[in-house]
Amino acid sequence: MSAPILEMDIDPVWGDAIDWEDIASRAAEAAAKVAPELAHENLLVSVVLADDDEVHALNKQWRAKDKPTNVLSFPMLSREEVLHAAADEGAPGMLGDMILAHGVCTREAAEKGVSVETHATHLVVHGLLHLAGYDHELGEAEAEEMENLERKALALMGIADPYAVED
């Protein structure tokens, strides 16, 4: 299965006990199975596993939010360009950048009762969908569409629905 090429930059705070590159690659493959526009090796994504300070600074600069967030996505292509990228046989096109915050990811994983690996996998899928032009902040229908794609991608990896409401 084709998926975007991932260029990884991993801050030491993430540690080396876990193969983060493998986790991101598997997440990209699953995302490409549910969002075919991502199923192309001529798309390039920069994935940065950063500390909270770096994500905080970027979130403040680009979104005017003075706090870290779990994942930031910076698309380089419009939705239309993503859809047409598959036809381009040339050099890889830059789909965009994705940055995950270690501390936020770790805290959220603990709150959800899942491993950091599981939550990071979800965030990579989520970020890739943003880079492909999906946006849950545009409205309820868009949020539902994006969440359904996330659920399907995660299910392919044996990961439970992150949006399930527990009683």
Swiss-Prot record:
Q: Which cofactor does it need?
A: Zn(2+)
Where found in the cell?
Answer: Cytoplasm
- Cofactor comment text: Binds 1 zinc ion.
Give the EC number: 3.1.-.-
Give GO terms: molecular function aspect only. metalloendopeptidase activity; RNA endonuclease activity; zinc ion binding
Name the enzyme's class.
hydrolase
Where along this sequence does the record place binding of Zn(2+)? H126, H130, H136
Record's keyword terms, sorted:
Cytoplasm, Endonuclease, Hydrolase, Metal-binding, Nuclease, Ribosome biogenesis, rRNA processing, Zinc
- Biological process, per Gene Ontology: rRNA processing
> Which InterPro entries has this protein been placed in?
MetalPrtase_cat_dom_sf_prd (IPR023091), YbeY (IPR002036), YbeY_CS (IPR020549)
Is Nucleotide-binding among this UniProt entry's keywords? no
- GO cellular component terms, semicolon-separated: cytoplasm
Pfam families recorded: YbeY (PF02130)
Family membership: Belongs to the endoribonuclease YbeY family.
The UniProt function text for this chain reads: Single strand-specific metallo-endoribonuclease involved in late-stage 70S ribosome quality control and in maturation of the 3' terminus of the 16S rRNA.
* Protein name from the UniProt record: Endoribonuclease YbeY
Q: Which organism is it from?
A: Novosphingobium aromaticivorans (strain ATCC 700278 / DSM 12444 / CCUG 56034 / CIP 105152 / NBRC 16084 / F199)
